[in-house]
C-alpha cells in the first residue's frame, strides 16, 4: 500500500492502521511514495522521506518490511532518488505513442505472431499483424525506455536491491489484455524484473474522490488484467508476486469491493497508492481542533480560491471541479469545526460533503507548505486528533472496504 504524506508527520498513524490489519490476518507492506514534483513543491528531498519512514517505523515499532518509493521517476530525475529509495516507479508516459526503431518494431511483430490463449478468457488475444503493429507503435518505445531506466538504476544501485514498478496509466485509453500481455512479455525479455504494473483503466480516477465511470466495465478490465498477469508470470519468469498497481487509488470506494473480491478469487496481490489524501486528513483534524488551527484551514481554502488556476492546472486530467459548487468565502468564514470537517471528509452519506471543495483542497497542499513552521506547529500541537483521522481513514474507509468486505 502506497502511504506516506507530504508533510512527513503521519507515518506512525498510518502504520497503526496497518498493525490493526495485521492482527486481523491482513498483511500489508507500506511503501512511502513521493514524486519529484511533490519534492520540488515541498522543498524536500528523497532523503527526507527515508528519514521520515525510518522514524515512523521506530515510533510504531513496525516489524515488517517497508519501502521508500521514487514515485513517477524518469531518466531526467532518477539520480537524486537512488541513494534513499528501494522502490522505483518508472514513469514512461512521455514515450507512449512515440515510434521505436523500425527494426525493433519488425522484430517485435515477428516474434509475437503465435496465437495466445489466456486461461479464463473466452477469446484468444489478438496477434494479427495490424494489432501487433498498433501495440508496437504505441508502447514499444516506452517499454525500451523503461528498460533503459531500470538498467541505469541497477548499474548504480546493484541488482536485486530494489523493487521495480512500471507506470502505464497516464494515457488516454485503457490497455487491452493483449497490450498488457505483450508489455509484460517485452519487459521480461529485456530483463526488467517488474513487480508491479500500473495500467490505465476506463473511467476517471480523480484525486481524493470516488471513481467516476462504468463499474461493470472496470470489473471486466481488472479481472482480465489479473488473468493476464497470472499467465505471464508462468511463461516469462517475472516475479511470482507481480501485481496490479492502482494509482490515485485512495477513496475509490465503489471499486474496493470489486478489487477485494477479485484478488481473493485469483489469490492475487494488489498495490494501492493512497498517500496523496493523507494531508486532507491532517486538514480535517486541524479543523476539528478549532481555534487558530481551524482559522488556518479556512485561510488555506480562501487562498486556494484566489490561486485556483495555478493550483489546478498541473492536475487537470485527474480533477473535475465545478467552481460554481465551491462554497463562498463568506459562508466558510462562519463555519464551525464540524461544518468544515463535514464538507471535507469523504462521507457520501453526509449531505454536507462537497466533492468540489475536497478536490480543490487536495491540490492546495502547496499553500500549507508556504505556512511552513506554522502548519507543522499546528500538526504537532494536535498530533493525537490528527493522527486519529489518518488512522481511521486508512483502516475504516480503505483497508476494511477492500479486504474485509466480502460482498
Residue ranges of each PLM-predicted region?
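Active-site capping/gating regions of soluble enzymes
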Residues: 1-38, 44-52, 58-60, 76-84, ...
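A generic local structural motif
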Residues: 54-55, 166
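Hydrophobic "anchor" residues on beta-strands that sit immediately upstream
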Residues: 67, 165, 243
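Conserved, mostly hydrophobic/aromatic
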Residues: 71, 166, 247
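Aromatic- and acidic-residue-enriched carbohydrate-binding clefts of CAZyme catalytic domains
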Residues: 103-134, 200-202
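Short, conserved phosphate-binding/catalytic loop or strand-edge motifs used
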Residues: 160-164
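Short, well-ordered beta-to-alpha junction loops that form the rim of enzyme active sites
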Residues: 168-170
Amino acid at each position: 500500500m502506497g502511504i506516506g504524506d507530504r508533510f512527513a508527520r503521519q507515518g506512525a498513524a498510518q502504520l497503526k492502521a496497518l498493525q490493526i490489519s495485521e492482527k486481523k490476518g491482513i498483511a500489508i507492506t507500506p511503501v512511502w511514495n513521493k514524486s519529484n514534483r511533490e519534492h520540488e513543491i515541498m522543498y524536500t528531498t528523497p532523503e527526507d522521506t527515508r528519514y521520515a519512514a525510518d522514524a515512523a517505523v521506530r515510533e510504531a515499532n513496525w516489524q515488517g518490511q517497508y519501502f521508500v518509493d521514487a514515485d513517477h521517476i524518469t531518466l531526467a530525475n532518477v539520480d537524486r532518488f537512488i541513494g534513499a529509495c528501494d522502490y522505483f516507479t518508472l514513469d514512461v508516459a512521455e514515450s507512449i505513442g512515440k515510434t521505436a526503431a523500425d527494426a525493433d518494431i519488425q522484430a517485435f511483430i515477428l516474434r509475437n505472431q503465435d496465437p495466445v490463449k489466456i486461461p479464463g478468457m473466452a477469446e484468444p488475444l489478438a496477434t494479427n499483424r495490424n494489432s501487433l503493429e498498433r501495440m508496437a507503435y504505441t508502447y514499444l518505445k516506452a517499454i525500451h525506455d523503461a528498460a533503459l531506466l531500470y538498467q541505469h538504476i541497477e548499474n548504480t544501485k546493484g541488482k536485486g536491491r530494489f523493487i521495480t514498478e512500471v507506470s502505464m496509466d497516464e494515457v488516454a485509453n485503457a490497455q487491452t489484455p493483449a497490450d498488457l500481455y505483450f508489455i509484460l512479455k517485452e519487459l521480461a525479455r529485456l530483463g526488467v524484473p517488474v513487480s508491479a504494473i500500473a495500467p490505465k483503466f476506463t473511467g476517471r480516477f480523480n484525486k481524493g474522490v470516488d471513481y467516476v465511470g462504468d463499474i461493470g466495465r472496470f470489473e471486466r478490465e481488472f479481472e482480465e488484467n489479473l488473468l493476464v498477469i497470472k499467465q505471464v508470470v508462468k511463461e516469462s519468469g517475472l516475479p511470482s508476486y507481480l501485481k496490479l498497481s492502482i494509482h490515485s487509488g485512495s477513496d475509490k470506494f465503489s471499486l474496493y469491493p470489486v478489487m477485494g473480491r477479485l484478488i481473493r478469487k485469483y489469490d492475487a496481490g494488489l498495490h494501492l497508492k493512497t498517500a496523496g489524501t493523507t494531508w486532507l486528513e491532517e486538514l480535517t483534524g486541524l479543523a476539528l481542533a478549532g481555534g487558530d488551527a481551524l482559522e488556518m484551514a479556512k485561510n488555506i481554502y480562501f487562498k486556494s480560491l484566489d490561486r485556483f488556476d495555478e493550483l489546478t492546472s498541473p492536475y487537470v486530467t485527474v480533477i473535475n471541479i465545478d467552481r460554481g459548487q465551491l462554497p463562498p468565502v463568506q459562508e466558510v468564514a462562519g463555519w464551525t469545526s464540524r461544518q468544515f470537517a463535514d464538507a471535507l471528509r469523504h462521507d457520501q452519506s453526509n449531505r454536507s460533503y462537497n466533492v468540489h471543495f475536497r478536490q480543490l483542497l487536495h491540490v492546495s497542499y502547496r499553500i500549507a507548505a508556504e505556512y511552513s513552521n506554522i502548519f507543522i506547529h499546528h500538526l504537532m500541537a494536535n498530533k493525537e486528533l490528527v493522527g486519529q483521522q489518518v488512522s481511521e481513514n486508512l483502516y475504516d474507509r480503505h483497508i476494511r472496504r477492500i479486504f474485509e468486505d466480502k460482498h
